[in-house]
């Protein structure tokens, strides 16, 4: 009897538990039916435990919402909100399936505040949270029959697998609307979506006003984002459904190259689109790209009929009118207000009584983001496209765009941007008088210009002949220049340098050597005198008759280090005098030959000793300490103490040369930039440097400053102390030497980073302090990095208290394959000052 009672009690308990579970979610199921209710503390979890649905409260708020977020990611990252316009005021709300089969949210009074508001075939429905983050309401008997899904009702986040519908024929689109603020999920004033009335392109609106657009889709990329061709692994994986649905609808979707990655696009409350990837190693979101990211990406930044060019400084004029146009308000343009745009100098002649030969014509602009509001006509032939535009007097321009076809513009040409790489050619309609005049006078003008051209050509040939004759005579006299002449600082500067660098700068007192004298010193560039080779050309050892050894950098005709870098090095290094900077002895400029002559460094470069196990023993701790200090003093001289404020931009182990006494000398100033002393940073489109040494703001945004050199110096410190290359950690859990340093630091094991060759030295404290300083120098944010004056003080003052470094994130991003870089040379141990790697950010 007692046993029977115990069994009865157990059965009763199970029945009660079952009844409770019919009213609340007692498991981590990914679905629920009419018999279940999601209340406070309950949640749905996707099958792979990637996403979670439940109740949440935003930061700095007391209101409650139902949303979807990434499970096990902190801080909580919400990707969808149901009741964003009608929050719950307390914790008494519930999510359930109503009697009509709709998914609803009710408050404590059982009033519906949000509903899917569809008409299911029956009320036998089920809500399922898929591993893509999509919440679906479907038939419980046939789960292939979907009635509603969150992916079709997005808030501010676009996830891989989401299909964004647009119907150009009906002018319908699906917009992503950001939160009003980080604590208020209600709809903000911005929106992002596919343009429903024009070309298939992404647009960000501020109310009804456009803020940014991507340019039309050409079946591979959005034409206004040419970088999509170079960021294929993670950043872009867009696809367009083809053919359209019966009603004309098409769908954009995004497919990640690695389905295990968490990627998300979202639009911030301030109207900026961003893309992130979750870094599992450091458990942080890596920012991959954002739009608009430059001045010229802002919508119609320069006004109508004007082109914006980010490679130019804004103060000096990023904006320029198209040929044949002029500023509407010249006084505003003089004050750098370009919003008024440009207007035609001469009206078009279409449909007017014309003088023969005065018909309108076209001028071409290349590398352009095509204007907004273009129309696509079904022609794929350039001449046919031109004829279509020429016959239409309202046509302002045309372009034949690969993947789209013939596009014409009948409205004002707006939102044009020039790209360094990529872009399209657009043909602008101009009055015939702006294209060279009428046919009646064309023969006369051809004759006149031909005569003038022939005269000028003959004059140029004569001047060039006289110049080369004088130059050869000069160089012949200089064949016997000796190194002792150089040491005595005799002035051998002459016209070739003036021709090279121009009269606008002070010409350095730099000796010029003839090609024959350099060839003689290097044994006609003998193979046995070759010291090394890189993307720039070849380096040779040379000996003058007095016995003085030199190193000769002979630039090849195909050198990536072109005339500008050659000029840069002559102008900079010839003016700099410091014991920790390499000394330039002279140059050779003859015909197509460009050569630089340096003092010879018998121990060559730091990387040969640092990363070669057979030579590491030559660098004991005392010598490494002196090398670190010498480099720091050389950098401080460049940044603060020289006549010029110079940012090196390519500081690395292979550009640190070692003399006979192993004293370090910074070399290779081909990529350096001069700042004035009130300037703290600059921008560039052409990002140059070396993989593993580039600061995040420089690699990602083209912004560089003395803090960029500080970052490179920090990497160099860590390499010197550890004896390991920064890039040797690529593909590991740490991502880079910086990540490895942080890993050991956070676990209190910094000592393990010290090179075993010097680990047993009595100066371990000194080595650990260097690691600490290196980590401070490689912090992600510019404002957190010390300047070189502070760095030198930290190194030399062993008693001062150092601030703790911040956890790095950028190092892992660079090493994850998210950024693709062009390598113009191989990363090998260099010789003397000559091997360098130029990297262009892609």
From Swiss-Prot:
Positions where Phosphoserine occurs in the chain: 559, 654, 667, 728, 830
Domain PAN: 350-431
Keyword Kinase attributed: yes
Phosphothreonine modification, residue list: 684, 837
The protein's Enzyme Commission number: 2.7.11.1
Keywords per UniProt: ATP-binding, Cell membrane, Disulfide bond, EGF-like domain, Glycoprotein, Kinase, Lectin, Membrane, Nucleotide-binding, Phosphoprotein, Receptor, Serine/threonine-protein kinase, Signal, Transferase, Transmembrane, Transmembrane helix
InterPro entries per the UniProt record, alphabetical: Bulb-type_lectin_dom (IPR001480), Bulb-type_lectin_dom_sf (IPR036426), EGF-like_dom (IPR000742), Kinase-like_dom_sf (IPR011009), Pan_app (IPR003609), Prot_kinase_dom (IPR000719), Protein_kinase_ATP_BS (IPR017441), S_locus_glycoprot_dom (IPR000858)
SMART domains xref list: B_lectin (SM00108), PAN_AP (SM00473), S_TKc (SM00220)
Organism: Arabidopsis thaliana (Mouse-ear cress)
Subcellular location: Cell membrane
CaM-binding, as annotated region: 614-631
Keyword Cell membrane: yes
Catalyzed reactions per annotation: L-seryl-[protein] + ATP = O-phospho-L-seryl-[protein] + ADP + H(+); L-threonyl-[protein] + ATP = O-phospho-L-threonyl-[protein] + ADP + H(+)
S-S pairs: 296-308, 302-319, 385-406, 389-395
Catalytic site: 650
Membrane-topology annotation of the record: Single-pass type I membrane protein
Signal peptide: 1-22
Domain named EGF-like: residues: 292-331
Domain annotation Protein kinase: ranges: 525-814
Enzyme class label: transferase
Name the UniProt record assigns to this protein: Putative G-type lectin S-receptor-like serine/threonine-protein kinase At1g61610
One Gene Ontology biological process: recognition of pollen
Binding-site list for ATP: 531-539, 553
